[in-house]
Amino acid sequence: VLNGWSKPWAMTGWRMGWSIWPNSAESGRLHDKVRKLAVNCWSCVNAPTQYAGIAAIDGPQDEVDRMMAAFDRRRKVVVEGLNSLPGISCITPKGAFYAFPNVAGTGWKAKPLASALLEEKGVALIGGPDFGVHGEGYLRLSYANSEENILRAIERMADFLAGGRPH
């Protein structure tokens, strides 16, 4: 199990995480390799960041629960909105606050579509190819924003796609 403070406690950029490993010979060999790879990540976490992590875990969790509920609502708005757009399909994300919709049905390549949406409609997306060779045909959209802004972005995307602009 790998996790961190980024999403549950909104500590993105603090770069602090943790892992749990089973106690077996097989996992022991893998654990040793991962530890050698990751030692620079955890050995350099400064003291204030560590104390902030402790406070996040030990402190009241009410705000975390409210934040998670808000992200759940936003995720539903994003998925429903993206699935309403012509040529776009989106499965419900399960772990992060990003959606990765398939845009192949629009006839556009991912990165040119992301650029056109930014330049013409002010909607910031990232082309799937930036995440690896299998990313073509996908965009990444963050829903770490207000529902109002998310709905505005979906409206602008709909307007762009309805424009019949050549790709």
Model-derived segments and spans:
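PLP-dependent class I/II
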Residues: 1-167
